[in-house]
Curated annotation (Swiss-Prot):
Family: Belongs to the YqgF nuclease family.
Protein name: Putative pre-16S rRNA nuclease
Entry function: Could be a nuclease involved in processing of the 5'-end of pre-16S rRNA.
HAMAP family: Nuclease_YqgF
Single GO cellular component term: cytosol
Origin organism lineage: Bacteria, Pseudomonadati, Pseudomonadota, Betaproteobacteria, Burkholderiales
Keywords for the protein's UniProt record, in alphabetical order: Cytoplasm, Hydrolase, Nuclease, Ribosome biogenesis
Compartments in which it is found: Cytoplasm
Domain of life where this protein originates: Bacteria
Alphabetized GO MF terms: nuclease activity
Biological source species: Burkholderia ambifaria (strain MC40-6)
UniProt keyword annotation of Nuclease present: yes
One matching Pfam family: RuvX
Enzyme Commission numbers on file: 3.1.-.-
Amino acid sequence: MSGASARDATLLGFDYGEKRIGVAIGNALTRSARALVVIPNLNREHRFKAVGDLLAEWRPDALVVGLPMHPDGTPHEMTQQAKRFGNQLNGRFGLPVTWVDERYSSVEAEAGLRERNVRGRARAEMLDAEAARVILQQYLDQLSDHEHH
């Protein structure tokens, strides 16, 4: 069998922000995701060097990018930037990109860190990676709702 099937794919999830990009890793077979790292979004060169290093290390089969929306589902000021980031990932690294509605990911991430008693600076530093985990987990949960084609 050549390559990983969609059922056991390794995935990287991204929560794109102007200052920071949260990254999570997940597996389609186990349907689980975990926060990985936060990349400072200093400039395009730094951003893609850091992403390239992660791709070399984790060798994902596909990427998931959170798409920020307003609560009513209309585009957010960050929607276009996140979409551009996903398109650049696809163009640069040749991996398929799926977008996931990330409307409540930061709220959920904040609550998850609070539940685990992560406080202060540690919470602030982990928040973006945890938001990426929430986004990726949402995608994985959708996979089990209707098996991946």
